[in-house]
Amino acid sequence: MTDQFDIERYLDNSRKVDVMDLHFESAADFSITAEEFRCLTYMMDIEAHTMMYLRALLRTCAVSDPEVMAFLHCWVYEEFFHGRAIRQFLEATGFRVDAFRADRVQRTRTWREWTEEWGSAMLCSVLKDFAAVYFTWGAIQELTTLEAYQILARRTQNPILRELLPRLAKDERRHFSFYFNLLQ
């Protein structure tokens, strides 16, 4: 790990995204577009599936570093609350969100996806630097999510969503910073 990312500071400041001051009950007063709904549903799925990605990651050599393990504990917690906040927003705007949506999506995994997950875990035990693949993928995911939140926040006409998304983006920026600095 480089000195550019202070894991202790990250651990001390890690918390769920604060949405207590957002008036979700008034979100329905301002509609969202079909494109925003599609995008938010996808984002909610990504955030909700963090646990599935973590499950695969825990089978690999990527977790041999104690700083990585410390980060992952906080990361999965923060990502869960991102998905929850998006779900709360969507439900407040009148969209019904299936509570078992993540499970249903997970059950549609193909044999190939399952094989790749286990194969990667085995490769990680043989190739010393294979963990860098996971960290690179993590950095890409965090950066694209960060950018998507920022773009959607600029475009939406819904003031509640416009307030929520930068809060999520702030966490994604910290997550990206961790992965980026880990790869240096």
Where are these regions (language model features)?
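Non-heme di-metal
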Residues: 1-184
